[in-house]
Amino acid sequence: MPAHFQRARNEEQRAVRRQAILDTAAAMLTDMPVAEVSLNALSRRVCLAKSNVLRYFESREEILLELLDAESRAWLDHLARELPTAVGADAPPATRGDGLAAVLARSLATRPVLCDLISAQAAVLERNVSPAVALTYKRAALANAEVLAGLVRGCVPELDERGALRLAGAVFLTAGSVWTHAHPSSAVRAAYEADPALAEMRLDFTETLQEVLEVFAAGLLARRRVD
């Protein structure tokens, strides 16, 4: 049991119990995809009744949105340490844009939990929450996008603030989409194996994401030069 008391009787104990629920859900995501993390299974793992879990979070989706924010912030902290030395400051803008795309794609590929959560965000996680929870999450998501935009401008200062924020938004949007297509169902994988002509439809996550981000960054830089 994650806490030694049976009932949270004050704010400190409530915070401990709430964090225990989040930590348990995070541990589950290392063993299974987002789609398999149910509220019932989480309740059993955290040794609480389902009704008690719902005292701390209004739904499974709220829990997972909080984890998505936490995973995003952890990734951004890592990027802030990696990017300054990973992208050559003296290279031409286009080369730095390509280098940035490569670092972002490789970095996200090492964080499957984050990518899985991003892929479920709009279609699943935002569908069973109250306006208050949605507002909290969207504010956090915007803050994370602004942090990423700042890191983007550190590598490619030729982009203005709006362009950097657009690229940051594209990173999150594209990562979720590419992750889903790069991890198809067993039936689709079997179809790929059965027909070699479908080989071109099989996507490698890192390679595909890098290529898309390279094109997006190049387009923003080209538009900036024209403007």
Predicted regions, residues:
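Membrane-interface starts of transmembrane alpha-helices
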Residues: V156, D160-A168
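C-terminal peripheral helix-coil segments that are non-catalytic and often amphipathic
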Residues: L142-E158, S177-D227
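Basic, helix-initiating cap at the start of DNA-binding domains
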Residues: M1-P33, N40-R44, V87-P92
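Alpha-helical structural segments
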Residues: V16, A20-A27, E62-T85, R106, ...
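Helix-turn-helix
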Residues: M28, A35-E62, E66
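Amphipathic alpha-helical interaction segments
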Residues: A20, A41, G99-V103, R166-L173, ...
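Hydrophobic alpha-helical connector segments
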Residues: E66, A80-L114, T136, L167-V171
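Helical hydrophobic small-molecule/effector-binding pocket
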Residues: D98-V129, H181-H183
